[in-house]
Amino acid sequence: MKNLLSIFLITLLPGIANDAPGDNTPINHLQIIGSHNSYKRAIDPKLFKLLQKADSISMSKIDYEHISLSEQLGLGLRNLEIDVYADTAGGKYAHPKGLDMAPGQPAYDTEGLMNKPGFKVFHIQDIDYRTNCATFALCLQELKKWSEAHPNHSPVFITMNAKDEPMKRPGFTIPDKFTPAIYDKLDKEILDNLGPKHLITPDDVRGKYQTLEQAVLKNNWPTLKQARGRFIFLLDETAPKNLEYVKGHPSLKGRVLFINAEPGMPEAAICVLNNAKKQLSEITSLVKKGYIVRTRADSDTEEARTNDKSSFEAAMRSGAQLISTDYYKKSTHFKSDYVVSFPDGGYFRMDPVFSKKN
């Protein structure tokens, strides 16, 4: 009798039993919650208080922090964001100006990692420089270690910003510009520290098709089974920076990262439309065509401060596969009940656009 009852309930509740992603589900039919600026630690209170006096509005927008990348993955998040600054010679970011602005802060970079050449990971030079992994190589090594300890994990999307904008303040560090040669080093860093077997690249998705976009429109994304244990990197940048990455690599041939390319471009595969409420119908249209879309549940701490989930609700309805938040856990910086997860409390599910229930 119990077995019959179980079968009856399963039949009545397809959303629970029959609509979960299976191994043959293409990865563009998944919906995932992830984090924004996933490496970020809080600005030291002494410095934050000083900066807040000068510009309280801007500082409120960056008043958040995250647990380690491994801990986020352990919770079930499958989209992380890592920002990188090029530092070819090393030492460019070894002594942030903020250390001198507010004396008495905890020691910074005690291991001397910032003096070594290579990509550095933090939010804003000289101001918001505390991070859970100081170098890109360390971030990648942490991802690999976690992945190999959980070899059957669902695919993880890594969104990246290539940071090179100067601060409009005298004396602040001027970042190196990202050029095709610097991007070559970025690709090499990923390959050296993660290895091809842990990656899904544009070449993998393009397959036999002439362009990446043609493959995407023919639903040539790998299945969940094929994507397990792997990472997909996305360069979320402006058109000029994206074009620098594409130079010499039409349709991203031989490149490691996907880019935020406009539909109609040979490189189009993953699109970034961050305003889920205003762009809901556009997002849904792109998702139905085969593109993967990243959007945001919240930004600048605004939704969390007012406990406003309307953007998150729009993001879920839109079918955007990647939904970014700063609040997979409640804020510890201000009082709020705002927290983002799917109705079942998880961060991974079948995309409602492709759900059997729809």
What do these predicted regions represent?
Residues D19-N358:
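Catalytic cores of phosphodiester-bond hydrolases, prominently lipid phosphodiesterases
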Residues M1-G22:
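Bacterial Sec-dependent N-terminal signal peptides
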